[in-house]
Amino acid sequence: MASQSQGIQQLLQAEKRAAEKVADARKRKARRLKQAKEEAQMEVEQYRREREQEFQSKQQAAMGSQGNLSAEVEQATRRQVQGMQSSQQRNRERVLAQLLGMVCDVRPQVHPNYRISA
């Protein structure tokens, strides 16, 4: 009977060691999964940062050229407005004199299509 008891004890100890090994294996697996998840998250973050930086550089290049274009258009518009204002100042008196001459200098005459019925 003692040998049976000793055999049972050995079986229980072997079962306990097997359960400990299984538990350790599960813990190692959980740690590996957690580590793999963290590494994957870091890779995703790094990729996202790279793509964001690439997008920002492309956006800056596109917006930079648009900024230059808008500045050039603004400057050209100012030059045209200044040219129109100077032209208006130069021609103002002459145009006013012409307009007043046409309005005030009335020459009455019979229209060529008018027929005198007699």
Curated annotation (Swiss-Prot):
One of its GO terms (cellular component) is melanosome. Residues 56-69, 78-89 have a biased composition (Polar residues). InterPro entries: V-ATPase_G. Its main location: other. One of its GO terms (molecular function) is proton-transporting ATPase activity, rotational mechanism. Residues 23-90 are annotated as: Disordered. It is a peripheral membrane protein. GO terms for biological process: synaptic vesicle lumen acidification. Keywords: Cytoplasmic vesicle, Hydrogen ion transport, Ion transport, Membrane, Transport. Residues 35-55 have a biased composition (Basic and acidic residues). It holds the Pfam family V-ATPase_G. It is found in: Melanosome; Cytoplasmic vesicle, Clathrin-coated vesicle membrane. Subunit of the V1 complex of vacuolar(H+)-ATPase (V-ATPase), a multisubunit enzyme composed of a peripheral complex (V1) that hydrolyzes ATP and a membrane integral complex (V0) that translocates protons. V-ATPase is responsible for acidifying and maintaining the pH of intracellular compartments and in some cell types, is targeted to the plasma membrane, where it is responsible for acidifying the extracellular environment. PANTHER family: V-TYPE PROTON ATPASE SUBUNIT G 2, VACUOLAR ATP SYNTHASE SUBUNIT G. V-ATPase is a heteromultimeric enzyme made up of two complexes: the ATP-hydrolytic V1 complex and the proton translocation V0 complex. The V1 complex consists of three catalytic AB heterodimers that form a heterohexamer, three peripheral stalks each consisting of EG heterodimers, one central rotor including subunits D and F, and the regulatory subunits C and H. The proton translocation complex V0 consists of the proton transport subunit a, a ring of proteolipid subunits c9c'', rotary subunit d, subunits e and f, and the accessory subunits ATP6AP1/Ac45 and ATP6AP2/PRR. Belongs to the V-ATPase G subunit family. This is V-type proton ATPase subunit G 2. It comes from Macaca mulatta. The lineage of its organism: Eukaryota, Metazoa, Chordata, Craniata, Vertebrata.
